[in-house]
């Protein structure tokens, strides 16, 4: 399954909201459709969101029918702003938009700018693919033979437009013959673990067990989990990390049980412009994601609901970051 493909100036995405029941690809021909796909999680995962955003901006630019820079620029800015407004937490989205904006700012010929925008989007895609491969290789070195690794949400090929980050580490360790196994949390409320990670683990041939989010502490207490590896949506300058809601709880549990807690993420997820996790904007999603499952109501009507999509794990709970440039370990004093 390919999460994202650029073909003949069209963006082809796998609709991840339908998995694992249906494998359906969507052909997106304009940037509005790309923005909607990002908002509705048809494409998801920080690296994949960044790649889709770049292609969406390129599509929007290709659709601007003028050869005059003075007319092109304000229309382009509308495109970029709409794509950037889709989801507030993932750093990769804003990184992609900034790079595309830089291409426009440095150009003088509209036709060439459009070509350069497509080239930049393809470059971003290739960079994320290569980064995920390197992350997986570095991370696999941390996994010992026979270990059982727990992962949360989905940070595999579907989420990264490439090989995977957290799940890529597990897949790489398996391919090295380390005889490992995995636990995958179902990841409420949208069940990315049950729907997507379980599917990718099954396809990779890795022995695993699917558990509810609240079971993780039980299995840590039983001593059957040797490491936790998760992805990230944004990492602050001090190492505080925003990831899928529930990640912080897992980090606290891992510390309490002496289990290493690793964050696997490309450099595009690191945001040096913010000092700490206090500055990370946490996306609040619609209450129906909690009160309904696939359109079926599971909670009483007219109740208050809180639905933050992410939480922030303080840097002092993270054993190390796994990046395409190597392993970044937490210093003893910081």
UniProtKB/Swiss-Prot annotation:
Active-site residues, as the UniProt record annotates them: 233
UniProt EC number: 5.3.1.23
Xref: InterPro entries: IF-2B-related, IF-M1Pi, IF_2B-like_C, Initiation_fac_2B_a/b/d, M1Pi_N, NagB/RpiA_transferase-like
The protein's role, per its UniProt record: Catalyzes the interconversion of methylthioribose-1-phosphate (MTR-1-P) into methylthioribulose-1-phosphate (MTRu-1-P).
Pathway: Amino-acid biosynthesis; L-methionine biosynthesis via salvage pathway; L-methionine from S-methyl-5-thio-alpha-D-ribose 1-phosphate: step 1/6
Keywords per UniProt: Amino-acid biosynthesis, Isomerase, Methionine biosynthesis
Catalytic reaction equation(s): 5-(methylsulfanyl)-alpha-D-ribose 1-phosphate = 5-(methylsulfanyl)-D-ribulose 1-phosphate
Site (Transition state stabilizer) location in chain: 153
UniProt name for this protein: Methylthioribose-1-phosphate isomerase
NCBIfam families noted in UniProt: eIF-2B_rel (TIGR00524), PRK05720.1 (NF004326), salvage_mtnA (TIGR00512)
Domain of life (superkingdom): Bacteria
Gene3D superfamilies in the record: translation initiation factor eif-2b, domain 1, Translation initiation factor eif-2b, domain 2
Organism ancestry: Bacteria, Bacillati, Chloroflexota, Dehalococcoidia, Dehalococcoidales
Molecular function via GO: S-methyl-5-thioribose-1-phosphate isomerase activity
Gene it is expressed from: mtnA
Top EC class for this record: isomerase
BP-aspect Gene Ontology terms: L-methionine salvage from methylthioadenosine
Residues annotated to bind substrate: 44-46, 87, 192, 243-244
HAMAP family reported for this sequence: Salvage_MtnA (MF_01678)
Similarity comment: Belongs to the eIF-2B alpha/beta/delta subunits family. MtnA subfamily.
């Amino acid at each position: 399954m390919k999460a994202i493909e650029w073909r003949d100036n069209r963006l082809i995405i796998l609709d991840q909201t339908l998995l694992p029941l249906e494998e359906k690809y969507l052909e997106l021909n304009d940037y509005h459709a790309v923005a909607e796909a990002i908002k509705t999680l048809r494409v998801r995962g920080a690296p994949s969101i960044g790649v889709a955003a770049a292609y969406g901006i390129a599509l929007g630019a290709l659709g601007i029918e003028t050869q005059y820079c003075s007319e092109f620029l304000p229309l382009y800015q509308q495109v970029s702003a709409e794509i950037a407004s889709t989801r507030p937490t993932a750093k990769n989205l804003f990184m992609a938009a900034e790079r595309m904006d830089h291409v426009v700012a440095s150009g003088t010929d509209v036709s060439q700018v459009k070509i350069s925008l497509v080239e930049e989007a393809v470059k971003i895609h290739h960079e994320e693919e290569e980064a995920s491969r390197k992350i997986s290789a570095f991370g696999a070195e941390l996994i010992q033979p026979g270990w059982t690794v727990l992962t949360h949400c989905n940070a595999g090929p579907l989420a990264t437009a490439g090989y995977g980050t957290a799940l890529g580490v597990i897949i790489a360790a398996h391919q090295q013959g380390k005889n490992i196994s995995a636990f995958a949390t179902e990841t409420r409320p949208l069940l990315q673990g049950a729907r997507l990670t379980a599917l990718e683990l099954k396809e990779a041939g890795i022995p695993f067990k699917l558990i509810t989010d609240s079971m993780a502490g039980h299995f840590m207490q039983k001593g059957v989990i040797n490491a936790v590896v998760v992805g990230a949506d944004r990492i602050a300058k001090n190492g505080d990390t925003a990831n899928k809601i529930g990640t912080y709880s897992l980090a606290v549990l891992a510390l309490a049980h002496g289990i290493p807690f690793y964050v696997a993420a490309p450099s595009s997820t690191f945001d040096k412009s913010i000092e700490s996790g206090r500055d990370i904007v946490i996306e609040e999603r619609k209450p129906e994601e909690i009160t309904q499952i696939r359109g079926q109501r599971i909670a009483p009507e007219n109740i208050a609901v809180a639905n933050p999509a992410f939480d922030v794990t303080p840097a002092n709970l993270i054993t190390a970051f796994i990046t395409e440039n190597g392993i970044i370990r937490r210093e003893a004093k910081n």
